[in-house]
Amino acid sequence: MNSASDTHFSLFGLPEHFEVDDGALNAAYRTVQSRAHPDRHAHASDAERRVAMQWATRANEAYQTLRDPLKRATYLLHLRGVDVQAENNTAMPPAFLMQQLEWRESLADAKAAGDLDALDDLLAMLRGEKRARYQTLAGLLNGGGHDAAAADAVRQLMFIEKIERDTAEAIDRLDD
């Protein structure tokens, strides 16, 4: 198995890019897990079982990070020494803040009216916005030299994903 200093990407033999081949990631994860799975080391020494458990845990964490685009982008920036500062840097461009307010108002109005069509429309629009922003983020991350802009894009995507979840939950509640 690889050394503890390897990246999540190298653990699975993948290039350090924002775009990840899901099939290759899944196959590599299964391979690493099969080698590190604690059941495979049931008759090993305590130390060997502990190491196997650590590798299985590391593989799970790496897999969860790489399969989620937002976590993957944050991780790539971390590898480059850039802290996204999601907790303490909530500064956003005024246009994005206005858009966010409009989305929140649309969500509140649709929920209050019980308007499933409006919620569906908002969810579709948010998903389209998210797709477009992920494409932009990929260009920033893969183009090099745009790490600060990529960190800003990650923070904006966090807001978009939050309102997307809130909208999907509102739809689920109305469907019940």
From Swiss-Prot:
The keyword Disulfide bond does not apply. One of its GO terms (molecular function) is ATPase activator activity. The keyword Chaperone applies. GO terms for cellular component: iron-sulfur cluster transfer complex. Keywords: Chaperone. Pfam families: DnaJ, HSCB_C. Disulfide bonds: none annotated. Residues 7-79 form the J domain. One of its GO terms (biological process) is [2Fe-2S] cluster assembly. SUPFAM superfamilies: Chaperone J-domain (SSF46565), HSC20 (HSCB), C-terminal oligomerisation domain (SSF47144). Belongs to the HscB family. Interacts with HscA and stimulates its ATPase activity. Co-chaperone involved in the maturation of iron-sulfur cluster-containing proteins. Seems to help targeting proteins to be folded toward HscA. This is Co-chaperone protein HscB homolog. It comes from Ralstonia nicotianae (strain ATCC BAA-1114 / GMI1000) (Ralstonia solanacearum).
